Amino acid sequence: MGTRFLLALFLVLLVLGFEVQGAHLPQQEESAGPALLTQMQESLSSYWDSAKAAASNLYQKTYLPTVDEKLRDMYSKSTAAMSTYAGILTDQVLSMLKGEE
């Protein structure tokens, strides 16, 4: 047997040994990840729901028709401006990606 064969055999056995050691990890660590993610999603969702409820209650308490009209007007103007700027940005990105022809 040559030294290359022994070296290759040693490396294969070393890799297999590490694979066997990795297989003995408890399964709880893998399942802990999704549970943590689920808890974070639930807490963020509850915070978002409470913030929406607080904003809705505040809006209902301070409802004024003139303010509501101004808010709707500002919303429509800002969405029109944002759609225009989004179109410009999209055109710029596409022209950069295409390059000069």
From Swiss-Prot:
GO terms for cellular component: chylomicron; high-density lipoprotein particle; low-density lipoprotein particle; very-low-density lipoprotein particle. InterPro entries: Apo-CII, ApoC-II_dom_sf. Residues 1-22 form the signal peptide. The keyword Lipid metabolism applies. Keywords: Chylomicron, Glycoprotein, HDL, LDL, Lipid degradation, Lipid metabolism, Lipid transport, Secreted, Sialic acid, Signal, Transport, VLDL. Its main location: secreted. Proapolipoprotein C-II is synthesized as a sialic acid containing glycoprotein which is subsequently desialylated prior to its proteolytic processing. Proapolipoprotein C-II, the major form found in plasma undergoes proteolytic cleavage of its N-terminal hexapeptide to generate apolipoprotein C-II, which occurs as the minor form in plasma. It is found in: Secreted. One of its GO terms (molecular function) is phospholipase binding. Residues 66-74 are annotated as: Lipid binding. GO terms for biological process: lipid catabolic process; lipid transport; positive regulation of phospholipid catabolic process. The keyword Isomerase does not apply. Residues 78-101 are annotated as: Lipoprotein lipase cofactor. PANTHER family: APOLIPOPROTEIN C-II (PTHR16566:SF0). Belongs to the apolipoprotein C2 family. Component of chylomicrons, very low-density lipoproteins (VLDL), low-density lipoproteins (LDL), and high-density lipoproteins (HDL) in plasma. Plays an important role in lipoprotein metabolism as an activator of lipoprotein lipase. Both proapolipoprotein C-II and apolipoprotein C-II can activate lipoprotein lipase. This is Apolipoprotein C-II. It comes from Plecturocebus moloch.
